[in-house]
Design a protein with these regions (language model features):
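Glycine/threonine-rich flexible loop motifs
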Residues: 90-99, 275, 389-397
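An N-terminal boundary/leader segment
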Residues: 1-54, 291-293, 349, 458-461
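Acyltransferase
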Residues: 21, 26-29, 57, 276-300, ...
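Short glycine/serine-rich loop segments
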Residues: 104-235, 408-429
Length: 461
């Protein structure tokens, strides 16, 4: 029963708790036992809350009295340590905040708790989320549950690793440059980067950092696509603080007319050649969609190399002065962790006229891609060109991010779902990208791919 609960979807757990087939306390205890079992090897959970079992007991009492708090009543979850939690230490992976205790929850945490979810603990992140290797000087390095010598990705590597390992049914990640999608890919789970402006970032660090933060979106990470669908409506919508969030209605993936979808697929973006196994996974995904009746064509969206270079230029535009300021304000000695030092030390701010030209180019690229998107409903492509790399090789993979980073510039929603598995057990993710505000289409497509591939598989830990 413990394994069944550890590996169940959040959707299944919510229904089982609500119908009293299982108790919330049983679900919480199963997750805590699994964390105790696997965390010494993967180092994904950096802190447990003191009151998870108490809250689970209260959830069970409420249910017995006929009170259902919301769609996640009694369901446990973990949370990336870049998101504030009232009364629970939030470090964002920086030494200066080792003992920092926020006095309020991030908006997404408030919404999850209001929906009845129970916080188990916090998961590891690189310092201020800025690395594709989940490592920091506070808690150390997180490892991939499918191969401990490999990275779980970043920056949401802690969330991806513990969800994949069965320690929590879901977590909330952040994605500035594929930081939900890359870890979902290498850890074999499902992850959603919503449309930019869909989910409030209030209470997430690095915080309001201008151009850098404008590319960031928060989203759910889970073992099953159905859980992304369950969680998005809970997270989405204005909170009266994040000035970039719009009150746009969500579509329902279950009523998407799949046989009317115009789907474009490609396996090679012309920047980084994917492995043969990655090509096979994407082709299998497109075959599954074709069998479902979509109208399919092969084409690479125009100007992906320019789009990626423009995003990279904008992120580097101030020479990472924003990161240096944050590290100083946090009281972290020196230049922060090795990962952030790699970014800060070579940074040279752009002159104003060059920055203006870069912003203009970004808007021109967005406009061109939107015009191209006029007769496209869904894009299917690699999440990354290779599976999880070994620890310490992160910088070598940077151009691999070109498959996913582009959509931090466009702001389009994207889902990654497990589409294949290497002979050694390493997962391969497939990415599905939809037009702005059409998460329903991306999720509907991901559900088809998941059904064909089998989706998440338990690691042999």
């Amino acid at each position: 029963m413990t394994d069944e609960l550890c590996f169940a979807s959040a959707t299944w757990l919510a229904e089982a708790i609500r119908t009293r087939r299982i108790s919330s306390l049983e679900a919480v205890d199963a997750c805590l036992a699994r964390i105790e079992e696997v965390n010494p090897r993967i180092n994904a959970v950096v802190r447990l809350t003191d009151d998870a079992r108490e809250r689970a007991g209260q959830a069970d009492e409420d249910l017995a009295a006929g009170t259902v708090r919301g769609p996640l009543h009694g369901v446990p979850f973990t949370l990336k340590d870049s998101l504030d939690t009232a009364g629970v230490v939030t470090t964002a992976g920086t030494i200066g905040w080792r003992d920092r205790v926020p006095d309020r929850d991030a908006t997404v945490v408030t919404r999850l708790k209001a929906a009845g979810a129970i916080l188990l603990g916090k998961t590891n992140t690189p310092e201020f989320t800025w690395s594709d290797e989940t490592d920091n000087d506070v808690f150390g390095r997180t490892s991939n549950p499918y191969d401990l010598s490999r990275t779980p990705g970043g920056s949401s590597g802690g969330p991806a690793a513990i969800v994949a390992a069965g320690g929590a049914p879901f977590d909330i990640g952040s994605d500035t440059g594929d930081s939900i999608r890359q870890p979902a890919h290498v850890c074999g789970i499902a992850g959603l980067k919503p449309t930019s402006g869909r989910v409030p970032r209030t209470g997430h660090w690095p915080g309001h950092q201008g151009l850098f933060e404008s590319f960031t979106q928060l989203g759910p990470m889970a073992r099953r696509v159905e859980d992304l669908t369950l969680l998005l409506p809970i997270l989405a919508g204005p909170d009266g603080e994040d000035p970039h969030v719009a009150p746009v209605a969500l579509g329902d993936p279950s009523i998407v007319a799949v046989d009317e979808l115009r789907v474009v697929s490609f396996t090679d973006n012309g920047i980084r050649t994917p492995t043969p196994e990655t090509v096979v996974a994407v082709e299998a995904a497109t075959s599954a969609l074709a069998a479902a009746g979509v109208r399919l064509r092969t084409e690479v969206p125009p100007g992906l190399d320019e789009a990626w270079a423009t995003l990279d230029g904008l992120i580097r535009a101030d020479g990472f002065a924003w990161l240096h300021r944050l590290i100083e304000a946090a009281g972290t000695p020196g230049w922060g962790s090795y990962a952030t030092r790699d970014w800060i030390t070579p940074g040279v701010p752009l002159p104003g006229d060059e920055l203006t030209a870069l912003i203009e180019r970004a808007d021109a690229i967005r406009a061109r891609l939107l015009r191209w998107l006029a007769d496209v409903d869904l894009i299917v492509c690699p999440a990354m060109p290779q599976p999880a790399i070994r620890h310490g090789e992160s910088s070598a993979s940077w151009f691999g991010d070109t498959y996913s980073d582009v959509h931090n510039l466009t702001g389009w929603p994207a889902v990654v779902v497990r589409g294949g598995t290497l002979p050694d057990g390493l997962p391969i993710g497939v990415q599905l990208i939809a037009p702005p505000w059409r998460e329903d289409i991306a999720l509907a497509g991901a559900h088809i791919v998941e059904a064909a591939s089998g989706g998440w598989q338990a690691p042999d830990l």
